[in-house]
Amino acid sequence: MNRIEKGSLLVLAIIVAFNIFFGLGSIPLLDPDEPVYAETAREMIQFNDYLSPRIYNEYWFDKPPMYYWLVAGAMHVFGDGEFAARFPAALMAFSTVIMLYCSITRLFNERAGFWSALVLATSVQFFYLGKAAVTDTTLLFFLTGSLLCYLHKQYWLMYVCMALATVTKGPIGIVFPGAIIFLHILCTGQWQKLFKMHCLRGLLLYFFIAAPW
């Protein structure tokens, strides 16, 4: 990474960090989703049970546990409050922007990387979800990571990202990127990629990570 790229990355990181983290815990958790995710994580800590999510002492499995785990970890560090409940979503939003910049810069050039990342960072929906205690930016991070890993031919890491996306929000974690990758191969005729991707062993790795929960 040259000086221009480092400078652009620093400017981008400052803009995104201010945009996402400023005032993160300044307003109460908003219905319907934020209080549910925060309370589920709090009860994981209370009952010392990180495998079976519950709310108001009732087991529930509406969502996989990834975001609850992240919020529980943040609560151990920052305490039980709005900031801790939203911090994982904000961190994942920040990380997605930085990952996108680094990846697009490597694939194309610094200008493309900077503007791609800046457009994402300043999108209204992205701004809202990055400051809310919901699963969406965590899912976005892993889905984006899986597709970027595919473009960079980092196939083992691609399967890991798909598995973690599944542990975040269910089968969409593999169905969504899998469909995009298949359509790309179909449209480009690059069928040899299927052999390079080690699909069978990759799926075994995917299930090794995603299936236990």
Please report, for each region that a protein language model flagged, where it lies by residue.
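Membrane-integral, polyisoprenol-dependent glycosyltransferases
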Residues: 1-213
